[in-house]
A protein has these predicted regions:
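Pre-Walker A (Motif I) flank of P-loop NTPase domains
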Residues: 2-5
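Hydrophobic anchor at the beta1->P-loop junction of P-loop NTPases
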Residues: 8
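P-loop (Walker A) phosphate-binding loop of NTP-binding proteins
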Residues: 11
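Conserved lysine of the Walker
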Residues: 16
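Hydrophobic positions on the alpha1 helix immediately C-terminal to the Walker A/P-loop
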Residues: 19
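NTP-dependent small-molecule kinase module
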Residues: 22-24, 150-219
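ATP-dependent small-molecule kinase phosphotransfer cores
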Residues: 30-134
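A glycine- and Lys/Arg-enriched "phosphate-lid" helix/loop adjacent to the NTP-binding pocket
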Residues: 103-180
Length: 219
């Protein structure tokens, strides 16, 4: 008996990890067997190509590694995590809350493809790769934590002052394309959008969490 998979998606700084932890804790408190997973799984050996890519080892811009190759890096990391860590729990009926998932591959890699027809082929290829060939479970719900691009840019700039950022975070044009991709995919796949700010002011994590719980009441 398969369990449930709920994905928290959104731009950097939108609070995915915080909200995933709050949601997992809430469901555990309610007596539902629940685990949280995070992607990329930087602690796992299979994330090595992802870490090298984000560090700029294969090129200093996201487009230096094409969408198909970069997607494979992330897909292998997810496959290893599923097989070694949370797959048995999920397949026995547990609920898994994921901070990012296949959805992030869709967003971040489709931005590298300008041609609309090729973008459609890429999305179909990625769906087959991760869900069919690698056998990863499809999400029961995707929550899109929505932040205006200007707020995202400010939060990333504040964080970059501490750690320098990765090749995605350092490319503002790339991040703007990702913001547009979120809008396209949310409409196409029925993701559930949660606004995380009012104007340029962030909502409290408690307020956002309460709305997520309301939106997921049927899952």
């Amino acid at each position: 008996m398969s369990g449930k998979l709920i994905v928290l998606e959104g731009s950097d700084g939108s609070g995915k990890e915080t909200q995933a932890r709050l949601l997992a804790s809430r469901r555990q408190h309610d007596g539902e067997p629940t685990r949280m997973v995070t992607f990329p799984n930087y602690a796992g050996e299979a994330s090595a190509p992802v870490r090298m890519y984000l560090a700029g080892r294969f090129g200093t811009h996201p487009e230096d590694v094409n969408a198909y190759v970069a997607s494979t890096f992330y897909a292998v990391d997810r496959f290893a995590s599923y097989r070694e860590d949370w797959g048995a729990f999920y397949e026995s009926g547990g609920t898994v809350i994921a901070d990012r998932y296949v959805t992030s591959n869709m967003v971040h890699q489709m931005t590298k493809i300008a041609d609309a027809a090729e973008c459609e082929r890429f999305l179909a290829w990625l769906d087959d790769l991760e869900y069919t060939k690698f056998g990863l479970p499809r999400p029961d719900a995707v929550i899109l934590l929505d932040l205006p691009q200007a707020v995202t840019a400010r939060l990333i700039a504040e964080r970059e002052g501490k750690d320098g950022g990765d090749i995605h975070e350092r490319d503002s044009a790339y991040l703007r394309r990702c913001q547009a991709a979120y809008d396209v995919l949310e409409a196409r796949y029925g993701w559930r959008r949660i606004p995380c700010s009012t104007g340029d002011r962030l909502r409290s994590k408690e307020d956002i969490h309460a709305e997520i719980c309301r939106v997921l009441a049927d899952i």
